[in-house]
Amino acid sequence: MKRVLISGADGQLVTDIIKVLSTPENDMFFNVMAFNRKRLDVTHKEALEIEFEKNNPDFFIQGASYHVVEEINKNPKEACDVNIASLHYLTELCNKYNCTLINFSTNYVFSGLKPPPEDFQELDHYNEIDDPSPVNLYGILKYAGEQILSTSCEKYYNIRVSGLFGKTGSRAKNGSNFPYTIKKNLELSNSADHLEPVKVVADQIVNVGYTVDLAEVIVKMMRQEKQNLYGLYHLANKGECTWYEVAAKVAEVLGYGEDKITPIPTDEFYTNLKRPKDTSLNMWKVENRFDVEIPRWDDAIERFFKNEVL
């Protein structure tokens, strides 16, 4: 039985990973020890050393992250400690204990300015061999964390995710996420006091990731662990989309008309922080190496509301 040590256990992605690890088909293979940040602070090396010595894990899932883009510029020291210093500690400990480190990065390591493909055989979305070029501090810190793993960690999966949404919501956003926010704003816009449509950015191209779908893939990666499969992967629901398109899909699922969502440019919504325009990811590598099929984003939005919200 593989021992799995998890930090950031109350995060929306990690919550679903724990659920999948605990299903009857998986719990015979994994013994899970999960900690929220109050119980295990990954910025304290001594605390990590105690848990590694006590549990001798086969996997460490680094679910603790400082990822609210707007807040990072206000608290760069804390963001560096969580997103960079912790990975120095974890890499050292994982190497010492022959443990596989699972870390989560972001589509924001890219500038969003990838040139269009010259012919149909080339990949038009960002793939794992494209060079990162982050445009804000969040992307810079996450890319720095990636480099620690790629240069120093012996066994790791570094997984770039994008636009996460799940039942738990983001702890850093008080249990909210993009679909929840759109649902709330649609309800407000439908009230007598707020008849204006919901404004949503329409010129950023991304992927979104339903945490249930992503958790299923991550656990399959753990089940199929082999030396030649370690490395960097992109993981989100398939199909590029704009935030406006996601919001329109949420409105459709909830029974609202198209007129309830209004597209706006990024500059009208975000005035102080640069964001990349097109960070859509290619999932070919993870699908082919682990023989998985990732659902499309619009299907994921429908299932999210049907299974976990409505």
Indicate residue ranges for each PLM-predicted region:
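Adenosine-cofactor binding site in Rossmann-like domains, unifying the SAM/SAH pocket
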Residues: 31-48
